[in-house]
């Protein structure tokens, strides 16, 4: 199953690494995103989602957790690595539990937020809605 988010545009490195354009999430990308949203337990503590990077073809993902109240992650090197390895555009899909990929539906004033308490089906349905 491939979930598609129809989006338009390109990625701008002028301080904004949020992805734009057409995005097709593979099953593996969806599973990775769900794992990211829920947070893994590391050294007895559940990691807090910090940043999720994805390729526009949905075949490459990378994410970080933050063990502190606030973290500052520089996503630019990861976005560039993704683009080198895949040959397609890449960008930040989410920060914490908020989706930032620009698609016209997911507007600046009303970003899609994903709860870690949602079931897999609820998360998948929200991704399909976008």
Model regions and ranges:
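Bacterial N-terminal signal peptides
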Residues: 1-8
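Secreted/extracellular ectodomain signature
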Residues: 14-130
């Amino acid at each position: 199953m491939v979930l598609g988010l129809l989006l338009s545009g390109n990625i701008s490195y002028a301080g904004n690494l949020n992805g734009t354009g057409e995005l097709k999430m593979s099953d593996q990308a969806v599973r990775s995103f769900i794992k990211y949203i829920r947070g893994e337990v590391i050294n007895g503590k559940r990691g807090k989602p910090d940043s999720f990077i994805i390729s526009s073809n949905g075949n490459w993902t990378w994410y970080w957790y933050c063990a502190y109240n606030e973290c500052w992650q520089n996503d630019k090197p990861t976005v560039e690595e993704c683009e080198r390895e895949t040959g397609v555009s890449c960008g930040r899909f989410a920060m914490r539990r908020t989706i930032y990929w620009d698609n016209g539906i997911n507007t600046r004033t009303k970003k899609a937020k994903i709860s870690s308490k949602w079931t897999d089906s609820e998360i998948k349905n929200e991704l399909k809605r976008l």
